[in-house]
Design a protein with these regions (language model features):
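Alpha-helical transmembrane segments of multi-pass small-molecule/ion transporters
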Residues: 1-310
Length: 310
């Protein structure tokens, strides 16, 4: 119950940030299209800093074992969910934005502040294991469907700053190299902006929408149901039958972090990619806002279910 209350407080805080982005557009300070610049800053600067900073922890056998559990769980969950959601997409005639919004969680923007707030900074590494796996899917599968490209450009994928940051972070961790304090502090400070910056982008986009149309669109609620209820319940079942929460003394907490990453609202990165690659960013933003609003209730409930059944 304690974790659920802390989680609810953190989600409300992030929702207030969305409201701030909404207000600065409605007040005429900026335009909703100005958010595209901030989206690029999040995608190509802030997220890489988050990843590198997360891997700047002490190398121990316990940490390595926990990291391997987190990576394995993240890969298994995301592959199984990709298969299930792709099948649902065909069955329910979902478009690219809907499929991406159901599949991709907002772990990149929420898991760091949420885990830091409810468990402590030392546990963030395991959340970043999920983020790293999801980033690979984001810059392959998600980029392909959102940009409507017919094939993968592997050179661009490999040379993407997010992919490079994952490699740098992993290499630094396993070689036990710590960056100079000044550089590490700078990277950490930039990375800490991820939650506010992403939420402000969402709020700015939301301000440019016809709110009556947003809330009258039944598809938004259908996508929200899939993202916030069905996907978490499927994930909970997968975690239960895999027995991965019992692989070590810390495994239950590690799997809780992975579960938290899965049950977050639809990814702000989908909105940002829609902006960058010319898809329906306003629809993606509407889904993001509605799922974030629902998360105030659904995420604490899902955590209670996890604590009860895992």
């Amino acid at each position: 119950m304690h974790i659920s209350i802390l989680l609810m407080e953190q989600i409300i805080e992030l929702f207030i940030m969305i409201f701030m982005g909404f207000i600065i557009v409605k007040a005429g300070i900026v335009k909703d299209e100005d958010s595209k610049v901030l989206s690029k800053i999040v995608l190509y600067l802030i997220i890489p800093c988050v990843i590198i900073n997360a891997f700047q922890v002490d190398y121990t056998s316990k940490t390595v074992r926990g990291l391997l559990i987190a990576f394995a769980a993240s890969v298994i969950l995301q592959l199984v969910l990709l298969f299930i959601i792709s099948a649902m997409g065909r069955f329910f005639h979902m478009n690219e934005v809907e499929v991406a919004s159901v599949y991709y969680s907002n772990s990149g923007n929420l898991i760091v502040p949420i885990v830091t707030f409810i468990l402590g900074q030392e546990w963030v590494l395991y959340g970043c294991a999920f983020m790293s796996v999801q980033l690979v899917f984001l810059w392959t599968h998600c980029k392909k469907i959102i940009s409507r490209e017919s094939s993968y450009d592997w050179r661009k994928i490999v040379l993407n700053i997010n992919m490079i940051s994952i490699v740098i972070g992993v290499v630094l961790f396993f070689t036990r190299i710590h960056l100079p304090q000044l550089i590490n502090d700078t990277i950490g400070s930039v990375g800490s902006m991820i939650g506010p910056a992403s939420m402000i982008v969402t709020g700015m986009l939301f301000a440019g929408m016809d709110l009556k149309k947003v809330f009258a669109n039944r598809r938004v609620y259908f996508v929200t149901f899939l993202r916030m209820l069905l996907v978490p319940l499927i994930s909970l079942i997968l975690i239960k039958i895999s027995h991965m929460a019992y692989l070590s003394t810390d495994a239950q907490k590690i799997m809780l972090i992975v579960f938290l990453a899965v049950i977050t609202p639809s990814a702000s990165t989908v909105t940002q990619m829609c902006q960058v690659y010319g898809n329906d960013s306003r629809y993606a933003s509407a889904i993001n806002v509605v799922t974030t609003l629902c998360a105030v209730v659904t995420m604490p409930v899902m955590v209670l279910l996890y604590e009860e059944f895992i």
